[in-house]
Amino acid sequence: MNDLTITLKQAAKEMEFDLTENQTLAFEKYYNLLIEWNKNINLTAIIEPKEVALKHFIDSLTCLKILEIPCQANVLDIGTGAGFPGIPIKIFRPDINVTLMDSLNKRVNFLNEVIKKLGLTNICAIHDRAEDFGQKKEHREKYDYVLSRAVAKLKVLSEYCLPCTKLDGYFISQKGPDIDEEVKEASKAIEVLGGSLLNIHKLQLPFINDGRSLVVIKKVKQTPSVYPRKAGIPAKKPIA
């Protein structure tokens, strides 16, 4: 048994995730593809098996500790990069529908290869800008859960994610340990975009002193049609 598998199984047990053998094999295939493609395109700086198991795979699953996502729920991962958190969640929860969105076509090509090689179904990867994606009728307020892992500051991320979140759905931002000031700065944006801060869950990744914060925002009213604004504007002029 290799380092990735040993660490993954131990950490999953610690976090009370019951991984099957097929799911473990899927994570191994995912890791091998990640390392292979990372030689040619910049997917991740984290490549050691133990670190990938903890800081990518297990970290991606942490939101499942705080939310009971129902069968057939529609989940969107904005700014997914190399597929985190969306692909690990799909491996562990094959019963949900996952959409991965990223602004770089090379990364989307990688995601499609992973989907194909792992034989994943009811999952797709889309090449788009978050600002454009959220204005499209087929995506606007269509997702039960919108996830994003440390893509931008929360006040910017909210403008990317809340327009795609269904009324009474949830936007979950996966962040590092020191999040309080960032949440405070985002309070106006969250309100304007139709969200309400529900909770901030703090946790530690197993075996390493690495804290995480999961910011849970509920969609309580429709997002005004002017949001998200045109590409580049949310980052340059965040709602304040």
From Swiss-Prot:
Places the protein is found: Cytoplasm
SUPFAM superfamilies: S-adenosyl-L-methionine-dependent methyltransferases
EC number(s) on file: 2.1.1.-
Protein function: Specifically methylates the N7 position of a guanine in 16S rRNA.
NCBIfam families xref list: rsmG_gidB
HAMAP family, per database record: 16SrRNA_methyltr_G
Protein name: Ribosomal RNA small subunit methyltransferase G
